[in-house]
Amino acid sequence: MTNFDEYIRQGEPQKREKGYAWQTAIGLQAVDGLKPSDYLIETARKDIEGEITIDEAEQLIRSYYQSKIAHTPEDVEIHEADMASTNIRRLLTEKTFAFTLVGLTSIHRRIFDGIFKFAGQIRDYNITKKEWVLRGDTVLYVSAPDIRKAIEYDLEQERQFDYSKVDRNGLVSHIVKFVSGLWQIHPFGEGNTRTTAVFTILYLRSMGFDVTNDLFANHSWYFRNALVRANYQNVQKGIMRTSEYLELFFRNLLLGENNELRNRYMVVNPPEELRAEQVQQIDRTSTEQPTEQVPEQVRVLLLTLSNEQLSLKGLMEKIGLKHRPTFVENYITPALEAGILKVLYPDKPNHPRQKYLLTAKGLALYNEIKSK
């Protein structure tokens, strides 16, 4: 995730505000495994420094993609990340907000203008989404004919809630319930989590909360997975809805706590090696050092692959990511460099049946985690 901390920490209010907005906007793309281009990062820095305006930044990004002759699938995804980041940056620095159905659909329209043809349009079809944290299962989202009424009901219930009658813990619990319920409606074909995040940030600001920290920027995938767990149950398998993970996120955001936010702790019916870690996680905070000193992405890759041999596409599907360059950069390359991962055909990197598997070192690390 791109780091604009140098601007956020320094004293100039305008640079700090724009630095936070860009960092959050870019970080939110991770909910769909997207990563912006280097050109977007360069353009963002110019905007933060005051060399260009946000209008000029947007025009530069549009022109950059219009000038491209060929467009690969990766280009389409990077274009989405660049445009959505630019649009979210603009939204987060505006001093306006409408706590209405129109306000919510307007946020979606403005984030995905020029990206999705259906930007700002409520879906007229039902959807399912395979979730890594649910091991391929899906949350049950609101049926298309009921979406408008569901949103209006949730917003009206929230308007009537009296925050003066709850303490800090009750406040966090209520915010969690509201945001979780709004997300479960999933009113759009794509982009629901990013829209919910921006709507939530603007709503919290309208109530006087200072949410200019790195939670949404650095933990957007956790935010999504926590929303999934808060809205999923399978009684037959003994899995109930739980808001505990989302509460940890919002306690960090609103109360300044330092709870540990780990995606792997949320996996339902986890394999043995993950189950042991989930037990150890209880009452731990992020000030504690994890047992294994490997990056979170490498750890997820290791535990996902285990004793299998999988193609790059197969690995991405199991983890729930779709942007190949980002996946290679953040997962595959670090694991290869750490000596944890290897390829089945090292002399033929482009072999049509190329697979990834753990090395002896990777298997030892996997077994060490499994034995805990």
Go through each PLM region and give its residues.
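FIC/Doc superfamily catalytic core
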Residues: M1-K372
